[in-house]
């Protein structure tokens, strides 16, 4: 007999975005719009692009209830670069040097339709060279919000993660139905000469996944 209403949770915040400027953080609950608790009747109100006032809150223990905490004003949306690299870190635990990368989509550059732009791929290689220079020997790859993208980006990422002695070997077989069987191909891991500067020669890999992990992400897993 209790009332029900829609709420939303912040999964992550892009750098230099209106959400970051407003102080939104991962894990914040949006309880209402224009300061009215439970006013999210349609999620499109959060996608409208206009300036809105949000009522934020937090969970109350294990009661499945929420309490309001603060109100923030979110400025009108504007274009910001949605890079695949949300967070990268290196943690030391005993004799372990643990690399962490949250990689949110497989794209070679900012323009998903311009395959000639490989600036993201170049950055990925440089990032792994940094991991290697810091003697990373364990790795956590966070693909919880990665819905896929370009297969050649997955090919590069896999080549940077695998054991050195399997570089150049088959990564996957791309097999089409009988109408396009002429497109079937075996996609190999890149050669040692192409990724040696950043290949971590890992013996194992920890992958974080979620309900939206799909497509090219599954190739890595």
Whereabouts are the PLM-identified features?
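Flexible, low-complexity junctional segments that flank or bridge functional domains
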Residues: 1-138
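Gly/Ser/Thr-rich loop/hinge elements
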Residues: 148-206, 212
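Residue-level signal for short segments within beta-strands and strand-turn junctions
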Residues: 56-58, 209, 219
């Amino acid at each position: 007999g209790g009332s029900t209403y829609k709420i939303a949770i912040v999964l992550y915040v892009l750098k230099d975005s209106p959400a970051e400027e407003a102080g939104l953080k991962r894990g914040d609950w949006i309880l209402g719009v224009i300061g009215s608790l439970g006013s999210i009747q349609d999620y499109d109100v959060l996608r409208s692009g206009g300036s809105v006032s949000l009522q934020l809150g937090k969970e109350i223990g294990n009661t499945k209830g929420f309490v309001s905490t603060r109100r923030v004003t979110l400025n009108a949306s504007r274009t910001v670069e949605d890079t695949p690299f949300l967070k990268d870190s290196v943690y030391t635990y005993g004799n372990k040097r643990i690399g962490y990368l949250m990689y949110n989509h497989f794209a070679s550059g900012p323009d998903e339709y311009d395959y000639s732009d490989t600036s993201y791929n170049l950055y990925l290689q440089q990032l792994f060279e940094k991991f290697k220079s810091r003697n990373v020997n364990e790795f956590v790859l966070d693909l919880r919000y990665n819905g896929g993208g370009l297969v050649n980006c997955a090919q590069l990422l896999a080549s940077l993660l695998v054991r050195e002695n399997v570089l150049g070997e088959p990564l996957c077989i791309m097999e089409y139905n009988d109408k396009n069987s002429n497109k079937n191909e075996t996609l190999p891991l890149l050669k040692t000469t192409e990724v040696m500067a950043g290949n971590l020669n890992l013996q194992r890999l920890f992958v974080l996944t979620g309900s939206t992990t799909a497509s090219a992400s599954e190739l890595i897993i």
